[in-house]
């Protein structure tokens, strides 16, 4: 099971989301924590300026950006649409 840390930037963006989206985010984080290779999350490595970060899908539009701190620990950095990648 992954240990998850939440950066202040992630918490701020999460708190700005609608309550229904917050619930969806919580569900996907639970899936990610218990099975980080879950196919429906579409976990993938980012490129370019974000090359040391990864992302997984909350839904068709929303992504969570994270980075590995160790094999069993990640830090969630941001949540939002594809503008996160800019």
Please give the residue ranges for each predicted region.
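Enriched for short, Lys/Arg-rich terminal
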Residues: 1-4, 8, 12, 23, ...
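Residue-level detector of intrinsically disordered/flexible regions characterized by low predicted structural confidence
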Residues: 9, 30, 44-47, 63-65
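A short, surface-exposed loop/turn module that caps and links secondary-structure elements
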Residues: 31-56
């Amino acid at each position: 099971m992954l240990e998850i840390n939440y950066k202040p930037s992630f918490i701020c963006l999460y708190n700005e989301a609608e309550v229904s989206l917050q619930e969806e985010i919580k569900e996907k984080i639970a899936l990610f924590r218990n099975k980080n290779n879950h196919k429906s999350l579409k976990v993938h490595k980012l490129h370019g300026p974000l090359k040391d970060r990864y992302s997984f899908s909350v839904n068709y539009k929303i992504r969570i950006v994270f980075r590995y701190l160790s094999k069993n620990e990640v830090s969630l950095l941001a949540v939002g649409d594809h503008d996160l990648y800019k």
